[in-house]
């Protein structure tokens, strides 16, 4: 019998905990907890723990801390100031206060509102940290904060908002109906407290007391004059009222109340507050109209999330004349890529920041409410500023391998930036004008290079790619600062590597910003590169050195420089750049490849008649061997050429290289190739004594990913599979 009672109590506690979850999703949090090793979740988790650790020493806040007391004289009475009301400058005493919509009065800090929000946020943080980490110190601190604000007879708040958002000089200092919204932060807090129910610190007695407290607050909201007046509002306040009432009802175990509000919501709120074109007329009148248009829809989304817990779905309801939540969401989402002056209402401040809030809510809808809205997912990915440490990541986001890769890359690049900045200050680097990193040796020594080095554009190119993915201005600023120091390379006619140097740096900057200054550099670099083209050979010369051995060397690497030329013809309409690129690709296709699809590294020509003098290697094991990176240059190069020309010969050849790579003898099981696939020892399975070439693997993975998009289903599956294998292996190595 004792075991039965204990089991029943445990099941009831678990059931009440699940029901009490309102906006947060327990299933999602369980998945997050199991995947904290992933870079994306790990970054947010570490930020959460850092925040939680900082809270362990804070003093609990309570309504007893405020500098002023409600007219009732009871210090336990919650008291807050109407946010947008300020002293009347025309009155000696400033009374009554007057409205300045959208402008917060700093006197708000003298009252309870900010401390309520801060307490709720602290409890949410500590509870989530306990759930994910298991440190009972977090649960104990959260319990201490809950006790001080809600339960301790000496410090607790009365369960009402009778004096919330009062206006000095009006109604004898009594609160207004709008003050009910001050408790909105309780919603997430209660989700956190529901997690705490599994901790040692949070007792069943405290849990019962808190449910009773919030039950009393719910009764006050449902029956008081202020509560009823708030429920009757025609704007975001009534929607926020419904959201709070549903959350309190779920927490207090009064599902009938929650279900009634949810069932009435479409007719009572949605269809009355949203116009057929998606505008919200009451919110559009505000001085922060974009903010409030979204703010109201956030409440909608919270309601839809809570409705799911009760098996109800109302987000898809549409009025006879077309009013719906999705009309409203689509309306504000359509301005995510538009400037403020295009918004049809007034928005005094905070437009860009609010767009980030809109993007996050698009994700919440697509992830938890209507999973068919892939357009919302895409728009979120396109417009959000990537911040792995954002709490949103833990609560709502599901990262993929690309997200994790960019988190790891971001960490590495931030460290690299600090190292580069230190190295550039050293006299030897400064005197030789070394500006960007080339490599770091096994002892951690970083090597910088001059603007004319073939890898000088790699680092700024990576920074521009970080900016492209993250939309974070930090990466743009860093990319700019590491791009312009190599500008002089645009005149460097002694190299074939201008595509590597300028195309990936200035070219990417031009692509992402559209700024003329970047375009001008890329055009000059393209002109300079074309000076190395010999019409008799029909290809761009590679090296100028070793003239005693070579007369006109062309290396397979040069395929990578053609992309800059193709893009320049597309942008200018001048065919000469494309003509050079096509000629070079054709000559290389004719002379560089063996029948099986593998490539020589170097082909030397006689510039007098264009004939082939010799075929050899310079970086591979032997003249007839398979230098892995060279095979990658070819695969990516011809796939890229097909992208610009749609010439089937290029596509066919790219596939030939890919198929050769798929079937080459001696390939390690993870498909990260040895540095050369004909070096002695490749016949030994996964030979640990032969260096691998991760750069070749990355290059091949990029080529395969694009090539798969041009291939039939069966062949694409092979390419995608291998690309994924290579990518995951490289990601795994990057995390070590």
Segments predicted by a language model, with ranges:
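Long, charge-rich low-complexity segments
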Residues: 248, 289-299, 305-306, 343-371, ...
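Short, intrinsically disordered/low-complexity patches at protein termini
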Residues: 3, 16, 55, 162-164, ...
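Short helix/strand-bridging catalytic loops that position acidic/His residues to coordinate divalent metals
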Residues: 168-173, 230, 279-288, 314, ...
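Flexible, glycine-rich surface segments
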Residues: 240-320
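Contiguous, well-ordered alpha-helical segments that form the cores/surfaces of helical PPI scaffolds
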Residues: 3, 8, 120-128, 147, ...
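Bacterial Sec-dependent N-terminal signal peptides
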Residues: 1-21
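Glycan-recognition and catalytic cores of secretory/periplasmic carbohydrate-active enzymes
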Residues: 94, 137-140, 144, 153-159, ...
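Extracellular glycan-targeting catalytic surfaces
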Residues: 19-228, 263-266, 308-309, 316-470, ...
């Amino acid at each position: 019998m004792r075991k039965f009672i204990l089991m029943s109590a445990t099941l009831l506690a678990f059931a009440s905990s699940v029901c009490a979850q309102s906006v947060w999703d327990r299933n999602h949090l369980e998945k997050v907890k199991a995947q904290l090793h992933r870079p994306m979740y790990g970054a947010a988790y570490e930020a959460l723990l850092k925040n939680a650790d900082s809270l362990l020493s804070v003093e609990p806040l309570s309504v007893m801390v405020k500098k002023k007391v409600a007219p009732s004289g009871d210090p336990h009475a919650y008291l807050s100031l109407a946010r947008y009301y300020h002293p009347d400058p025309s009155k000696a005493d400033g009374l009554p206060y007057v409205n300045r919509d959208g402008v917060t009065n700093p006197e708000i800090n003298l009252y309870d509102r900010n401390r309520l929000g801060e307490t709720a946020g602290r409890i949410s943080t500590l509870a989530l940290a306990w759930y994910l980490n298991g440190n009972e110190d977090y649960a104990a601190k959260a319990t201490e904060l809950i006790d001080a604000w809600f339960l301790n007879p000496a410090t607790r708040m009365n369960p009402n908002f009778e004096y919330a958002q009062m206006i000095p000089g009006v109604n004898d200092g009594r609160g207004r109906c709008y003050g009910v919204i001050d408790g909105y932060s309780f919603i997430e807090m209660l989700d956190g407290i529901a997690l705490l129910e599994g901790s040692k610190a949070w007792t069943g007695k405290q849990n019962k007391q808190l449910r009773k407290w919030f039950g009393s607050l719910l009764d006050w909201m449902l029956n008081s004059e202020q509560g009823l007046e708030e429920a009757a509002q025609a704007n975001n306040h009534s929607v926020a009222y419904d959201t709070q009432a549903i959350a309190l009802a779920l927490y207090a175990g009064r599902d009938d109340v929650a279900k009634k509000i949810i069932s009435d919501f479409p007719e009572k709120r949605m269809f009355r507050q949203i116009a057929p074109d998606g505008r919200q007329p009451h919110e559009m009148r505000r001085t922060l109209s974009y903010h409030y248009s979204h703010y109201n829809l956030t409440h909608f989304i919270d309601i839809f999330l809570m409705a799911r817990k009760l098996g109800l779905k109302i987000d898809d309801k549409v009025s006879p004349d077309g009013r719906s939540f999705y009309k409203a969401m689509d309306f504000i989402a359509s301005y995510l890529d538009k400037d403020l002056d295009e918004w049809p209402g007034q928005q005094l401040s905070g437009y860009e920041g609010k767009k980030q809030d809109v993007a996050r809510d698009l994700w919440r809808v697509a992830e938890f409410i209507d999973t068919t809205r892939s357009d919302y997912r895409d728009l979120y990915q396109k417009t959000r500023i990537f911040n792995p440490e954002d709490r949103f990541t833990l609560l709502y986001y599901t990262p993929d391998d690309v997200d994790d890769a960019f988190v790891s890359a971001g960490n590495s690049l931030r460290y690299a930036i600090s190292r580069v900045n230190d190295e550039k200050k050293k006299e030897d680097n400064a005197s030789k004008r070394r500006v960007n990193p080339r490599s770091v040796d096994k002892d951690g020594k970083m090597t910088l290079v001059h603007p004319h080095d073939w890898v000088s554009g790699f680092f700024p190119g990576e920074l521009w790619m970080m900016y492209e993915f993250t939309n974070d201005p930090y990466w743009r600023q860093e990319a700019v600062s590491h791009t312009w120091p190599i500008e002089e390379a645009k005149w460097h006619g002694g190299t074939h590597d201008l595509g590597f140097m300028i195309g990936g740096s200035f070219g990417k900057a031009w692509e992402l910003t559209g700024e003329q200054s970047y375009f001008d550099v890329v055009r000059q670099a393209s002109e300079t590169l074309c000076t190395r083209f010999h019409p008799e050979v029909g290809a761009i010369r590679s090296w100028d050195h070793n003239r005693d051995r070579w007369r006109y060397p062309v290396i397979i690497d040069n395929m990578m420089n053609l992309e800059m030329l193709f893009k320049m013809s597309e942008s200018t309409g001048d065919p000469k750049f494309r003509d050079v690129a096509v000629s070079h690709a054709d000559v290389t296709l004719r002379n560089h490849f063996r029948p099986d699809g593998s490539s020589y590294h170097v082909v030397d020509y006689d510039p007098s008649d264009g004939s082939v003098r010799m075929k050899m290697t310079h970086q591979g094991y032997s003249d007839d061997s398979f230098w892995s990176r060279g095979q990658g240059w070819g695969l990516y190069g011809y796939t890229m050429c097909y992208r610009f020309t749609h010439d089937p010969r290029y596509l066919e050849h790219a596939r030939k290289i890919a198929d050769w790579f798929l079937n080459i003898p001696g390939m390690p099981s993870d498909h990260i190739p040895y540095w050369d696939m004909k070096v002695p020892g490749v016949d030994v399975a996964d030979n640990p004594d032969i260096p691998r070439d991760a750069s070749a693997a990355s290059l091949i993975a990029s080529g395969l990913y694009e090539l798969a998009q041009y291939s039939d289903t069966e062949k694409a599956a092979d390419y995608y599979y291998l690309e994924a294998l290579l990518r995951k292996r490289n990601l795994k190595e990057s995390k070590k």
